[in-house]
Amino acid sequence: MIVTNDFVDDVNNIHPKDKQTAGLRFANLALYQLYHNPTKLSPNQVFSPEPIVPYYGKPNEVYVNFFYAEKLHSTTKTIEGFELAGIDGVFYPAKAVICEEQSTIKLTSAKVKKTTQVRYAWKNTAQPTLRNEYNMPATCFWLDDIPVGIVEDIE
């Protein structure tokens, strides 16, 4: 899967006008997956999020680590599109901060005390702003069944 909604100029039309960028992303993905020919963009076509249980005694925080992603950054001042839900299943916008090692995002929401679900760019008109070092956008995702609980502070 590749992401194309980051360069769509009309969110009501699923066919991007920029066919060259879409074609290049598909070609790099094929080279990597079918022929194991690593190009600098190939493993970065899809960010693979993995939830990390909230920790350090703060149940309203959740960390999402992105494999195949280094030097995460946003194309806008704030990272938009992350949402958190608690046990009630109601999603609220989350504040997203890139952690120091630049492959993990810290998410918080004052309205969610114990996070059980995380989603990113989960809207028909979403245009992802989170990018990796090759300026490839993160894919939309929905992580559910995040264990409710806190891992003790490890020092």
Model-inferred region functions:
Residues E70-E155:
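C-terminal beta-sandwich/jelly-roll accessory domains of carbohydrate-active enzymes
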Residues I2-T4, F67, A121:
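Generic beta-strand/beta-sheet core signal
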Residues N12, N60-V62, S103:
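Structural beta-strand/beta-sheet cores of well-ordered domains, especially the beta-sheet scaffolds
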Residues M1-G23:
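Conserved, well-structured interaction surfaces
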Residues Y32-T78:
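Surface beta-strand/loop "capping" patches
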Residues F7, Y32, N124-A126:
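Short loop/turn segments at secondary-structure transitions that flank enzyme active sites
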Residues D18-H36:
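Non-catalytic, well-ordered alpha-helical segments in soluble enzyme domains
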